[in-house]
Amino acid sequence: MSTPEPTGGPVTDEERRAAGMATRREVLGDAHVDRAVAGSTPFTADFQDFITRTAWGDLWQRPGLARRDRSLLTLAITVALRHWDEFALHVRAAKNNGLTDEEIGEVLQHCAIYAGVPAANHAFAVARPILEELRAASPS
């Protein structure tokens, strides 16, 4: 097995942590990240660091997919796995990454066939008030 080509991304844990925290804040928003960090305990601190370094400092840094595409995938996966808190969080992230309400709706329609109508139905119920809130808060 050959060694993958370097991506030019972060290499050390500290670089991954810094890049991950920056990306996490850009995608999820400062308010969410501040709550997650403030809510960290000695029991959860290592897990929060793991998420920041691996999910945000490694996976979301890879050049193969744009953040917008990663958001599409994340929405679909969280619906399929019925992880509703993560789904709600990533509806907001998807908007931050440039997805429209219509595109989010299309993801959920697609999920109805591949992940089940009950999951997609619940996803619409979770997404609707979030999208309404974001529309109301957006300067038009």
Residue map of PLM features:
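Short alpha-helical scaffolding segments that buttress acidic/His motifs in well-ordered protein cores
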Residues: 51-55, 72-79, 107-114, 123
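Mid-chain, well-packed structural core segment of small domains
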Residues: 75, 79-105
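Substrate/cofactor-recognition hotspot
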Residues: 117
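Acidic, glycine/proline-rich low-complexity segments that act as flexible tails and inter-domain linkers
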Residues: 2-68, 96, 122-140
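Alpha-helix N-cap/helix-initiation sites
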Residues: 62-70, 84, 101, 105, ...
